[in-house]
Amino acid sequence: TVTFQAFFTADSTNTGTVSWVLAGVACADNDTINASFGTGVAPTAKAHSGTANDLDVTAESGAVTIAGSPSTDEEVYFQITRDVSADSLTADAKLLGIKLFFTTDAANDA
């Protein structure tokens, strides 16, 4: 599993909330890349600051389970969406990036 934080802004003084949802799927050699993503997870919807183009950072999400049983030498695809049914910002939210949190099995990458 992974968790994430979303970094976003809005060109608006609206103080509504924004909800970002992350889902993932792993694909191995000879797997179809038209695979279904796992269940999307969203951190608590974050209110925009009310100042146009301010940086807004969400809280860390709950665990996002990656579909496809990820393993060594597999590629992972992520899908991030805005869930407007769970937020209240009436302006366009602009996703700037995400911070992805994950645990590795090795102390180094050697």
For each of these PLM feature ranges, what is it?
Residues 9, 43-51, 63-67:
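Beta-strand-rich interaction surfaces with strong enrichment in secreted/lumenal proteins
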Residues 9-17, 28-30, 86-89:
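Extended, low-complexity, turn-rich repeat/linker tracts enriched in Gly/Pro/Ser/Thr and Asp/Glu
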